Amino acid sequence: MIHNNRLRIVMQKNWKLSSDSKDLLVRCGIKINLCKQKLIAFSENMPIDVMCVRDDDIPGLIMDGIVDIGIIGENVLEEEVLSRKLRLDSVDYIKLKRLDFGVCRLSLAVPIDKEYTDIYCLNNSRIATSYPHLLKKYFDKKNIIFKSCMLNGSVEVAPRAGLSDAICDLVSTGATLEANGLREVQIIFRSKACLICKTGNISVEKQNVINTLMTRIQGVIKARESKYIMLHAPIKKLEEVIDLLHGAERPTILKLAGDDSRVAMHMVSSETLFWETMEKLKLLGASSILVLPIEKMME
């Protein structure tokens, strides 16, 4: 049983966002036993219950006020918003934060041998998709007439099977399109995972848990975006070294025993440190360069 005084979080049960969502909760310090056989799991150390459902059920559970918070892809969220508007259902929700996973794009793709110059080549075409409302919204803005072929899976096989002239589907790397003789021609929607919350009254107790959770999520994301850097640098080149590294704050500078010409520098870099940057540091005389991952971070 889910208790009303506990924060209710809903997330995808299977597929792409499931493992990343679980990892986020674990990194936020939420002790919870999630498994495929259980639809509901209860946190051992926080007043939080987690429901695992189909991804396209998540927006409705939030907008109908059944659960408090959801982790969902923006593509699924926007498609459901458009669908619910047509049905005159409530579409109230608050987007708390875009997350750092679930990156993809909804794109149009055509057979490799199909002549294509611009989007208007698809006028009066039949297009297979799992996102008919997002597709219609995009084509309506372009005043393009089309016929929709609704498929809930294996959209990429539709042209080869003679079901459609083109497809509109999610793309991550493009490898699946290429394997099915298709090429991406137009991005119509860019998506990431996001954290959404229901509107309406939320108890003080639940709001406190939400605030704690948001602080921890921000810390997890910030830590994943940052690296802890330690190196030795010549004092004369110190400012040039610092300029190469974009830090959250000014670095910590320490004297080196028995060497007055060099110092040790420690800092949190807010950007990924590429090999090219490390090579530039080396040219400035830096040595003993260490780049370490950060597990948790709070500013």
UniProtKB/Swiss-Prot annotation:
This is ATP phosphoribosyltransferase. Keywords: Amino-acid biosynthesis, ATP-binding, Cytoplasm, Glycosyltransferase, Histidine biosynthesis, Magnesium, Metal-binding, Nucleotide-binding, Transferase. It comes from Buchnera aphidicola subsp. Melaphis rhois. Its EC number is 2.4.2.17. The gene is hisG. PROSITE patterns: ATP_P_PHORIBOSYLTR. It comes from the Bacteria. Pathway: Amino-acid biosynthesis; L-histidine biosynthesis; L-histidine from 5-phospho-alpha-D-ribose 1-diphosphate: step 1/9. Belongs to the ATP phosphoribosyltransferase family. Long subfamily. Equilibrium between an active dimeric form, an inactive hexameric form and higher aggregates. Interconversion between the various forms is largely reversible and is influenced by the natural substrates and inhibitors of the enzyme. GO terms for biological process: L-histidine biosynthetic process.
